[in-house]
Amino acid sequence: MKFGYKFSNLLGTVYNKGNILFTPDGNTVISPVGNRLTVFDLVNHTSITLPIQSKYNIRRLALSPNGQILITSDESGHTLIINLTRQVVLGEYKFFKTPKSILFSPNGAIIAIAVLEKVFLFKTPIIQKQPNPLIRLSVFTHKSAVISMCWSADSLKLMIGCKNGTLLIRQGKSERVSYFQVKGSGIINCFFGNEESTIAYAVTPTGLASWDYKTNEEMEQEKLERVENGETAYLREEEMDEEKLKVITENQRLYKGRWIFKGFKKFENYGVKCKVKTVCFHLKSKLLLVGFSTGQFILYEMPGFNQLYKLNISSHGISTSAINNTGEWLAFGCSELGQLLVWEWRSETYILKQQGHSYNMNTVAYSPDGQTIATGGEDGKVKIWNTTSGYCYITFTEHEGPVTAVKYSPVSSQNVVFSAGVDGTIRAFDLVRYRNFRTFVSPNKTQFSCLAVDPSGEIIAAGSLDSFEIYVWSVRTGRLTDILSGHQSPVCELAFDPINPFLASASWDKSCKIWNIFEDREIRESIQHTSDVLTCAYSQDGKKFIVSCLDGTIQIYETSTWGQIGLIDGKNDIMGGRGYKDEILAKNNSAGRAFTKIAFTPNGECIIAGGNSKYICIYHIDQQVLIKKYSTSSNLSLDGITLDINWKRVGEFGHLDAMEKDFDSDDDLYQQNKEYLTGSSKGDLSKRTTKKKQKTTSISVSPTGRAWAVSTTEGLLIYSLDDFLFFDPTDLSIDINPDSILSELNLKNYLKSLIMSIKLNEKPIIEKVFESIPFNEIQLVCQEFPIYYLKNFIQFLSGYFEKNHHLEFQMKWVKLISIYHGKYIKTNSLSMITSLRNLQKTITQTYNDISKVCDDNIFSMEYFKTVLLKELKSQEETNKISKKSQKYKKYLESKKNKEQEEDQFSDDEETVYQNNKKNKNK
């Protein structure tokens, strides 16, 4: 089994606190999720969490105009400079407090960062790592804390809004500053109203104040017109008092003109229970978006302050808002509900509507095909998440109490998920019709703590917290078939044997019992332990059974003889950090040093275990050793992350994290926690400041074995062997043009030239590079091809197939792309379904055309072959006959010659004989 699991995605949490951003193209939203960042692609409907963690919860975000540099700052002022394209940290910077505002200039050359009363100007870093990423240019100090800033369109002016109602406009390198004072109220945000920067807006909790910049010539002209009309030339102070707002401009005569107060307009729904929470302004479309604490937002058209749209989108206050580059999409974040919305106000439709669990997530389960994940939380909701897109596409709210367990039916064709809750019900949900089609209840009202489904999906069992019994139901009939009694403490875990008809139950009474619920309904085996049993699990083949105990041990049993074959002591591996309320060191604290959740890998060789700490451990069963250890979080905003506490934060009256704060600047800028004041009649007097502790509440392994998920305090973490983190491997600092592409091609950098051509998106260039890649280099290019451009490349292949007929060359590409990236193509088939269908259609059509010609050619070749064979055969026979005849002729000739020779020889002998006879006679 491979152990190269890496963090892949974070589900279950879409927004915590801080501001949200649109990317420059307007199609992507960046949302802070704890100490991580989640990017939502609104066009492809996918979300991915960047593999970057800050030290504390992120509170401020800023993105450069070109979308390459992202700056984040957390609660402690720790600032990260991130290359968003490559998803790497370029550098770090430490401020003494969390910045209230971080803003890039429109030309992208300068960064303005406001920290308390100071405004720092830095030079924008390059997209490469360097020792000092932020070079400070200048710093300005003010009398009050800076709340907001705004750059002019030409990047020469910087507007600064302070907490005491002071508004300043700094111009370029000069020391000239324009001052405005809004008495009686603070400033929430400030903006320039036009591209010429001659209109200034300041948003207060009650309304909107505006100023116009008038040149000396314009003021003289207006003065003459007013004198001719019998009007005064200047606005009197009494007129401002009527608006209950006094605005004081500088008395000095400015260069070429001065700022003139135009008026103050109140928000129509302002009241005691309705406070302004967030404001943003879109310069191109002149839209002002105001979000209120009631969950309502109003869209105004400026400069006329005309109300265009009004809608209530949430039951809680809107924490942050943003407008995309076209002004059509409005993004909202609600920290109390963990909700993220994107609304298209012209068509009145949701582009994105995601919400995590309001409270902690208790349980998680993978579907049989590994495509979806079911989660249950303390808020009584069951959510179904798509592992590919990272979106929640259905939420079931039928439970009236916290959900303690969720399980999928092992039969994938049933499309059923079961859930158990403390409300005393077991509910079955249909994932096709999205409804609760069956509810199982016990005779006596009880709280269910665990759930198990048999391999056939026909029987479910649930364990009780208060009655210590196990209830068994038939899914088909919905009737209670049996009640199993025998435990003396709450039942904490149930597990069905995948092969044999047995049910295992674990309880706090230090026992683990094996039930035969299908035959005699009696206890087949009872395993006693020396400490409380926390959880148990079967392997996929049913041959091994593991039990986790309170003493930190994991005991391994063989199911054939139920003999113990191994013991893993993991209390030192699961040891977490020290909490701010702990009086002893973490290594001396025995509390929580046990595995509360364990799961087998699909091959049954390893187990994945977690507990009340930030660590996840993977053990090998046979060797009983720790193979790998994962840390689920490094967020110091959570408790129990470090091995020891920070003694600088411990005072005479305890730890600073446990003390109440009269003013929380991150939650509400202008509202103190008055419920803690002496004589206050409202508020919960039992409230305390607490920190969440990082722990693992559930573990589930994908049936494919390539991923596993854990539900933690921060959300649902997915660790995978597949690299789904998209990044652009092309160095964006290089000028991508046809000449640079051809030069890379001449240098035989085939992969880089192909990616650059796809990025340039000019078909002739892509075709030239594509056809220039040698046949023997295709495999290497396909193997290293980034999935970031896979969709565009498949689209190119589908179009290239229709026009060109380099069949073997094209099929080589298709084959190798499918081999090396088939997993990703399968899981993301919906996003590229059009290109895949076009490619399939073209290949099928080519196959049909070629196959018909090939079949005809094959038949013709068979005919010619047959004729040729016959001809050859007849020719061979003829040759054989001719050879025989020739041999016979030769034989006859040789015989004739022989006879002639014999005749001649006989004549000669006769002559000799006669001569001899004559001689003898003589």
UniProtKB/Swiss-Prot annotation:
Gene3D superfamilies associated with the record: YVTN repeat-like/Quinoprotein amine dehydrogenase (2.130.10.10)
Keyword match Repeat: yes
InterPro entries with a match to the protein in the record: PWP2 (IPR027145), Quinoprotein_ADH-like_sf (IPR011047), SSU_processome_Utp12 (IPR007148), WD40/YVTN_repeat-like_dom_sf (IPR015943), WD40_repeat_CS (IPR019775), WD40_repeat_dom_sf (IPR036322), WD40_rpt (IPR001680)
GO cellular component: cytosol; nucleolus; Pwp2p-containing subcomplex of 90S preribosome; small-subunit processome
Keywords: Nucleus, Repeat, WD repeat
Disordered: annotated segments: 893-922
WD repeats: 12-52, 53-92, 94-132, 141-180, 182-221, 271-310, 313-353, 356-395, 398-439, 443-485, 486-525, 528-567, 590-629, 691-731
Domain of life of the organism encoding this protein: Eukaryota
Biased composition (Acidic residues): 900-911
GO biological process: maturation of SSU-rRNA from tricistronic rRNA transcript (SSU-rRNA, 5.8S rRNA, LSU-rRNA); ribosomal small subunit assembly; ribosomal small subunit biogenesis; rRNA processing
Localization in the cell: Nucleus, Nucleolus
Family the entry assigns: Belongs to the WD repeat PWP2 family.
Main function: Part of the small subunit (SSU) processome, first precursor of the small eukaryotic ribosomal subunit. During the assembly of the SSU processome in the nucleolus, many ribosome biogenesis factors, an RNA chaperone and ribosomal proteins associate with the nascent pre-rRNA and work in concert to generate RNA folding, modifications, rearrangements and cleavage as well as targeted degradation of pre-ribosomal RNA by the RNA exosome.
Subunit (UniProt): Part of the small subunit (SSU) processome, composed of more than 70 proteins and the RNA chaperone small nucleolar RNA (snoRNA) U3.
Cross-referenced PANTHER family: PERIODIC TRYPTOPHAN PROTEIN 2 HOMOLOG, WD40 REPEAT PROTEIN
Protein's UniProt name: Periodic tryptophan protein 2 homolog
Organism: Dictyostelium discoideum
Gene: pwp2
